[in-house]
Amino acid sequence: MPNNMEQENIQDNMQEMEAPLVQMQGVDVMNDDNLILSDVNITINKGEFVYLLGKVGSGKSSIIKTLIAELPLQKGAATVADFDLWKIKTSRIPFLRRKLGVVFQDFQLLMDRSVEDNLLFVLEATGWKKRGEMIARANEVLTMVGMQTKAHKMPHQLSGGEQQRVAIARALLNNPPVILADEPTGNLDEDTAADIMNLFMKIHAQYQPAVLMVTHNRELYKRYPGRVLICENGGVREMEQEIYFEI
């Protein structure tokens, strides 16, 4: 039987293990002085896959920008990967972003660099020093997304789906506990979008990150399991499963 001190340590460890990877409590999402969303409450735990829906201009992307500290927190409380967004200093924001895998709709690859050099650029920017280890890690994540034979291609030589796979590989470089994906299939045709979603689901099943995916594509959350949040009327609410399968 554990003594009292050991029991307290066990409870503390359990609390740490169970701490949400993404949490927003009573947050007002602001863009300059404009109130976008009010009283936002979101909790995402390790291993959860959560969709964030809403019309254009409803505030979905502003939530992502708040979570990566691009938009400052002005009201409420928020933590991401153990970083307190209320207290975070500008000098600490790069360390926060190393814990986040961010995937955008438009890929945002460096068009004048090869696939491998795109990844090496990120590794160097996030503190990696040894080139051999950097190349090995780049090859590892490219293999994870099925792009290991494309390392020396230039982005313009790749299809849209292939560019998005590289963007996902880039997001995985530092083993992030949280993945934030902003319309990652928005520029892709239906078949390519399905391939990318299957890749996301494979990564999620294997590594169990917390995933928040912004999308307007209702077919995604019908075909692939996950919680569903919706931005509407200046707030965020959770959709019941039986409702969103009927939409």
Give the location of each predicted region:
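Conserved ABC ATPase signature
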Residues: 154-164
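A short, proline-enriched helix->beta-strand linker immediately N-terminal to the Walker B motif
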Residues: 173-177
